[in-house]
Amino acid sequence: MLRAGAVLVVGTVLAGCTGGGLSGESGTAGGGSSAKYGTSPLTDPDGTKPGLAPISSGQDEATARELISKLQTKGRGPKTGYDRDEFGYAWMDTADGVPLARNGCDTRNDLLKLHGRKVQFRAGSDCVVVSMELYDPYTGKDIVWKKAKAAEVQIDHVVPLSYAWQMGAARWGKEKRQRLANDVLNLLPVSGSANSAKRDSGPASWLPPNKATRCSYAVRFAQVAKKYELPVTASDKEMMLKQCGG
């Protein structure tokens, strides 16, 4: 137990990582990870490892295209009836069937702990993050974050909830919608400005400004769509393939 006034500091340690990280902006063949960029989505199919490392090798791009090519396509349906509350209250810890559920910590703080470095918690807590450092895969920038300016880091739904609603989630039961909204596979802490710019866009309308991460982003989008049996629009699928050399 922490004494009052104490601050717990946690440094993120990645198994198999070297202190030097990756050279340049590239991922490693067959996936891999680095201390700065985190883990390639190709070796993190459930989203429980930190970061979103770039994919750049021809072999990895081919693997990415194979995944994306299997996605079904359909037109985007109406937004009628969509409301954020249809996916449960924000950052609920009780969405059964997803990693980190019912661990006593809300989804937002789970994500900050998972992806942040030099994490500091509120005194007496091992959940509430009050400061950290974050490499933002969307912008390629390092962020020094403090809870006093919480909006500088926001949690992005890789497949936006409104997008999912229009692509079929409107017909799901509430439990499945709650899983999508709180599944770490579909969540990344990123800069608030990037998240605000994305809104509910699919890949054809918005991609991370950091070009090195775009194939990885497409892979993560495809992983979520595959897991939840969501189709994507034809233009989104085409753009995703293009980011991975297609």
Where are these regions (language model features)?
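Bacterial N-terminal signal peptides that target proteins for export
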Residues: M1-A6
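C-terminal motif of bacterial Sec signal peptides marking the signal peptidase cleavage site
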Residues: V13-G16
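Bacterial signal peptide processing site
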Residues: T18-G21
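Extracytoplasmic/lumenal low-complexity Ser/Thr/Pro-rich segments of cell-envelope proteins
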Residues: G24-A35
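Cell wall/extracellular polymer interaction/catalysis modules
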Residues: S33-K141, K146-K149
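Domain-level detector of nuclease and nuclease-like folds
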Residues: P137-G246
